[in-house]
Amino acid sequence: MGKELKRDLPDGGQIIMIQGAEEDNNVKLVYQGFMEELEGSNLEVVYEAHCKGWRAELAVDYLDEALEKYPDVSGIMCGNDDIAAQVVRVLAEHRLAGKVQVVGQDGDLAACQRIVEGTQTMTAFKSVELLAKVAARYAVSMAKGEKLSRINSSINDGSGDIPFCMLQPISVTSRNMDEIIIDGGYHSVEDVYLNVPRED
């Protein structure tokens, strides 16, 4: 998400972060990666909020408050695409939809529609098929007592470090929507381009 904002905002700008539940370890990992990606850029995080219990509707008040303080915001990092939906709605009310870069994650159909409509910049997509294939491969290897390959990270659950294979999400934008989402069979062309004509 940070990489996409850096690419789309080369001159820098103010960034708002509206994340998921603060106690969710995934939120902490995404935050860490996002901040590392922004290092050395002219992008400045000026406002941060967390949607308790991943309640996306909380983003409405957070963004209204943030826009009062920072009306010239350039980009908004959203914890997921549900939060991004609320953010885009508020931006539309302020006549800013499509003018402020919005990034989210999950690859929801509605997010894909917003991307081709121009109100959301990108979604970080995690292929369920790939996750299932990798999980099945590891399950078979473990059942056979084989050494696990490609373990590239670990996480501490309080009792010790648990090794795991971290898969990288795919940045889906209007540039690769057809290739990743439609050709991949995740959402149909008719559904993604429901509200706008598809450019050939």
Regions found by a protein language model. Give the residues of each.
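Short beta-strand elements at the ligand-binding edges of bilobed clamshell
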Residues: 1-4, 17-21, 48, 117-129
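Hydrophobic alpha-helical segments within soluble ligand-binding/sensing domains
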Residues: 1-15, 29, 57-60, 107-111, ...
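Sec-exported extracytoplasmic/periplasmic mature domains
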Residues: 3-11, 35, 39-40, 64-72, ...
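Hinge/cleft segment of the Venus flytrap/periplasmic-binding protein
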Residues: 14, 18-26, 36-38, 134, ...
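Proline-centered loop/turn at the N-terminus of a beta-strand
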Residues: 14, 99-101, 122
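Second-shell loop/turn segments in exported
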Residues: 20-22, 46-52, 72-74, 122, ...
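Hydrophobic alpha-helical
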Residues: 34, 47, 52-114
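Extracellular/periplasmic ligand-binding modules, especially the Venus flytrap/periplasmic-binding
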Residues: 80-88, 116, 122, 126-144, ...
